[in-house]
UniProtKB/Swiss-Prot annotation:
Single GO BP term: translation
NCBIfam families: PRK01151.1
Family, similarity comment: Belongs to the eukaryotic ribosomal protein eS17 family.
Protein name listed in UniProt: Small ribosomal subunit protein eS17
Length: 71
């Protein structure tokens, strides 16, 4: 099982994804750069955790859209 993310990681990730949905992809490296540009996050660890959470959300949305299209 994976780790549970703190609320501040989820809320920041959700806010960034809502404000800039076209800036994020299913690539962690690209999302990491986008988070660094869009948000003022002082620590690398928090930036990476937010980018990882956003990557997971984008992948989940794509899989859900693919499943709905197949059904």
């Amino acid at each position: 099982m994976g780790r549970v993310r703190p609320r501040y990681i989820k809320s920041l990730g959700d806010k960034l994804l809502e404000m800039y949905p076209d800036r994020f992809t299913d690539s962690f490296e690209e999302n990491k750069k986008a988070v660094a540009q869009l948000a003022d996050i002082p620590s690398k660890r928090v930036r990476n955790r937010v980018a990882g959470y956003i990557t997971r959300l984008v992948k989940r949305r794509k899989a859900q859209e693919k499943a709905e299209a197949a059904a």
